[in-house]
């Protein structure tokens, strides 16, 4: 079964996120558990936690259908010690917030070397950062998102994701989220079913489908292999509809949150309905 949704707003309170997801016909959702552009946030109160859990139950969302995203400020591979510690503290707080909310996944961008340290050193720092957070939390999996490779961001090659996982001590609590726009911009072709087969065969060989814990379904304004991160609505960009139809009809993508971060929230309900229809079309066939 496919869990399909979008990254919805938690404005006005975390408990509003499940309702907003339900309104667009989603069976999954992503959210920020705090302001993503600030380092610090007030601790979660028992009331906020209870309200969120009640809303999830009301709208039939289990933890397996929810893919929280951490702050954009965090860089777990930062080359400067003081800044690295600040990011690690913030990441631990994000993991603990998920733990308090009964969530089991935390999606994050791996990190950037900022042209100051070697790629290998940065990847090792990211893995160490994950180990530190996992040692102080329980039940939450750190879900590494592939990047487009813009600037000095790492995680744009499957080999880089595999290297981070290799450095994580508890393999049961590390996973990967594949963003289709990022993959395409990083040079992994998705424009035809044959290209999708090839790209995900490579993913399976290098990373492994056992680590796939979520996906971001985005078309791309950016060109193939451009290393530029620019999302687009499904079928409107340079990837096209075929990739998303192919994903919907492949059982390897069952049981994980498939999250839209496409650029027009006004048509998310339509995009979700279209994705669901592709799945039904395969079942009928």
From Swiss-Prot:
Kindly list the cofactors needed. Answer: Zn(2+)
The record's annotation in SMART domains points to:
AP2Ec
Annotated Zn(2+) 3 binding lies at 182, 229, 231
Binding-site positions, Zn(2+) 2: 145, 179, 216, 261
Q: What class of enzyme is it?
A: hydrolase
InterPro entries, from UniProt?
A: AP_endonuc_2, AP_endonuc_F2_Zn_BS, Xyl_isomerase-like_sf, Xyl_isomerase-like_TIM-brl
- List the EC numbers from the record: 3.1.21.2
One MF term from GO for this chain? Answer: phosphoric diester hydrolase activity
Determine the domain of life of the protein's source.
Bacteria
Reaction(s) catalysed by this chain's protein: Endonucleolytic cleavage to 5'-phosphooligonucleotide end-products
Specify the protein name: Probable endonuclease 4
Q: What is the lineage of its organism?
A: Bacteria, Pseudomonadati, Pseudomonadota, Gammaproteobacteria, Enterobacterales
């Amino acid at each position: 079964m496919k869990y399909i949704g979008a990254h919805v707003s938690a404005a006005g309170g975390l408990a509003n996120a499940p309702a907003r997801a339900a309104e667009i016909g989603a069976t999954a959702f992503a959210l920020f558990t705090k302001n993503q552009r600030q380092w610090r946030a007030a601790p979660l109160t028992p009331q906020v936690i209870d309200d969120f859990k009640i809303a999830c139950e009301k709208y039939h969302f289990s933890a397996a259908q929810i893919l929280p995203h951490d702050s954009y400020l965090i860089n777990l591979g930062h080359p400067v010690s003081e800044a690295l510690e600040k990011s690690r503290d913030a990441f631990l707080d994000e993991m603990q917030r998920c733990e308090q909310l009964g969530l089991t996944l935390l999606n994050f961008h791996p990190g950037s070397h900022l042209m100051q340290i070697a790629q290998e050193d940065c990847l090792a720092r990211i893995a160490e950062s994950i180990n530190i957070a996992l040692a102080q939390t329980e039940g939450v999996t750190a879900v590494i998102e592939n990047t487009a490779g813009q600037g000095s961001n790492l995680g744009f090659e499957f080999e880089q994701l595999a290297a981070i996982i290799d450095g994580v001590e508890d393999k049961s609590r590390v996973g990967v989220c594949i963003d289709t726009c990022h993959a395409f911009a990083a040079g992994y072709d998705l424009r035809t079913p044959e290209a999708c087969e090839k790209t995900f065969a490579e993913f399976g060989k290098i990373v492994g489908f056992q680590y796939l814990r979520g996906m971001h379904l985005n078309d791309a304004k950016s060109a193939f292999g451009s290393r530029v991160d620019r999302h687009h609505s499904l079928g409107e960009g340079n990837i096209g509809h075929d990739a998303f139809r192919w994903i919907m009809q492949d059982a390897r993508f069952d049981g994980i949150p498939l999250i839209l971060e496409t650029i027009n929230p006004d048509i998310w309900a339509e995009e979700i309905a279209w994705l669901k229809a592709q799945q039904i079309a395969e079942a009928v066939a």
